[in-house]
Amino acid sequence: MPEAPKVPEIPDWQKPPRNVSLRIHAGENLNTTPNNEPHALIVKIYKLRQNSNFQQLPYDVFLNTQKEKEMLATDLIEVKEVTLIPGQKFQFEEKVTREAYFIGVVGLYRAPALNRWRLSFAAENVEKTGITIGAHGCALTVGAGQVIETANFNPKFLNETRCQ
């Protein structure tokens, strides 16, 4: 009896988008000044084809929308901005196309802590768990979602984080 033909695998671009739950909890001490006065914080959410470029760009690139688009080039699929106020909890379902393999998050802090203002996640890994991020005085933390590439710190905790 002849073997049944194998069903071809569906290419990523034909699969339905992923639904990723994104939660950002802003602390009461959000984006603080040297006098510990809290301020609003802009958080940018990126849908990316690749994340290596995103991980290497310096902070100031993300402050300039045009420069950011030029530097991320073809890696960038979409970027959204959310403005948070101290104590706010923000939650939404994000549709992530299959061509976006990564989700990046940047907190545009007044004085960001070294290496604590940017996070990236593999979209496939956070489809089930979602992403929960804490936004604090000068740093981001992660409550849910597996982070890619953290440089010598545990993204779940603020210990040893120094605001400038």
Q: Language-model segments: which ranges?
A:
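Bacterial Sec signal peptide processing site at the extreme N-terminus
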Residues: 1-14
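Short amphipathic, basic-aromatic surface patches that mediate peripheral association
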Residues: 22-34
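Gly-Asp-aromatic-enriched flexible segments
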Residues: 21-22, 114-122
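A generic structural micro-feature
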Residues: 14, 35-37
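Short structural boundary motif marking the start of a folded domain
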Residues: 16-20
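Outer-membrane beta-barrel proteins
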Residues: 10-12, 31, 82
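Glycine-rich, aromatic-bearing surface loops/beta-hairpins
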Residues: 118-164
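Mid-length scaffold segments of soluble, non-membrane domains
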Residues: 38, 45-115
